[in-house]
Curated annotation (Swiss-Prot):
GO biological process, one term: peptidoglycan biosynthetic process
PROSITE patterns, alphabetized: FAD_PCMH
Keyword Ribosomal protein: no
UniProt superkingdom: Bacteria
Catalytic activity: UDP-N-acetyl-alpha-D-muramate + NADP(+) = UDP-N-acetyl-3-O-(1-carboxyvinyl)-alpha-D-glucosamine + NADPH + H(+)
Organism lineage: Bacteria, Bacillati, Bacillota, Bacilli, Lactobacillales
Protein name per UniProt: UDP-N-acetylenolpyruvoylglucosamine reductase
InterPro entries with a match to the protein in the record: FAD-bd_PCMH, FAD-bd_PCMH-like_sf, FAD-bd_PCMH_sub1, FAD-bd_PCMH_sub2, MurB, MurB_C, MurB_C_sf, Oxid_FAD_bind_N
Length: 316
């Protein structure tokens, strides 16, 4: 029995798409195919997929809303799991519990509707709740670490555990999940009672700032670089004269140099080449080495062509 036949038998009823292009699921609008793109409807289907992948030595990864990633042009081998159907959100007193696939911006709006404060900083951050925890997303002085109460995860071995904020060892755009290989299932956020109008005014203010300063009209991967200590990445890039600098179809935004936008059918290789070139030019100009915030996943087109027709099974 082939892997595909076994997969269809054991994972019957789960939405699996074969050789699915990932560019339509990514904010950058680039990316090759996933061998198997999976849309679990609940944590039990997710656990079944992970168990099968581990048993068959098939690599797997979970993507949130793919808002701060670049998928290479050769795509991703093995399973790519999209959890956007795990999107339930509930409110209990001053606590919001959200599944990993819940939209982060919509979750902040739910907090607003219940006059709960503490989530305003995230009102314009694209992505999923799970992805936000994974990278400790933040903006305007706030971050997920400030409001997370607990997090339920599926370990890489298929066990369900509940972790505290301390367990997650949050840092700047970092959580322990990045090393553990666990998958966020749901999150509890501890908020505080507030005044609806005051919360709305703050969210409107932050939304206006984002619209004013960021190139939201173009596909992008969000902030490309982490903030260097004592500096701002966008300012360093601008001072190096790189606003409008372009490779292929991707360019450094004129509006905010910390963003790279897809202006003309750019490719993942265009993004990678531009990122590397900007790092080198900023280093040459200021002596500061920028560190990527955006994650780059998958294989280059040349590597993918070498293994066309299959993949080499490997441990995740």
């Amino acid at each position: 029995m082939s892997v595909r036949e076994k997969m269809l038998e054991i994972l019957e009823g789960i939405d699996i798409r074969f050789k699915e292009p990932l560019h339509s699921y990514s904010y950058t609008k680039v990316g090759g195919e996933a061998d198997y793109l999976v849309f679990p409807r609940n944590r039990f289907e997710l656990a079944r997929v992970v168990k099968f992948a581990n048993q068959e030595n098939i690599p797997w990864m979970v993507l949130g809303n793919a808002s701060n990633i670049i998928v290479r042009d050769g795509g991703i081998r093995g399973f790519v799991i999209l959890c956007d159907k795990l999107n339930n959100v509930s409110v209990d007193g001053y606590t919001i519990e959200a599944e990993a696939g819940a939209n982060l911006i919509e979750t902040t709006r739910i907090a607003l509707r219940h006059s709960l404060t503490g989530f305003e900083f995230a009102c314009g951050i694209p992505g999923s709740v799970g992805g936000a925890v994974f990278m400790n997303a933040g903006a305007y002085g706030g971050e997920i670490a400030h409001i997370l109460q607990s997090c339920k995860v599926l370990t890489k071995d298929g066990e369900i555990e509940t972790l505290s904020a301390k367990d997650l060892a949050f840092g700047y755009r970092h959580s322990a999940i990045q090393e553990s290989g666990a998958v966020v299932l749901s999150v509890k956020f501890a908020l505080a009672p507030g005044t609806h109008q005051v919360i709305k005014q703050e969210m409107d203010r932050l939304t206006h700032l984002r619209e004013l300063k960021q190139p939201l009209e173009y596909p992008s991967c969000g902030s490309v670089f982490k903030r260097p200590v004592g500096h701002f990445a966008g300012q360093l890039i601008s001072e190096a004269g790189l606003k409008g600098y372009r490779i292929g179809g991707v360019e450094v935004s004129e509006k905010h140099a910390g963003f790279m936008i897809n202006v003309a059918d750019g490719t993942a290789k265009d993004y990678e080449d531009l990122i590397q070139s900007v790092i080198e030019k900023v280093k040459e100009h200021s002596g500061i080495t920028l560190e990527r915030e955006v994650r780059i996943l998958g294989e280059s087109l040349s590597v993918a062509k070498m293994y066309a027709g299959g993949f080499t099974p490997c441990k995740r």
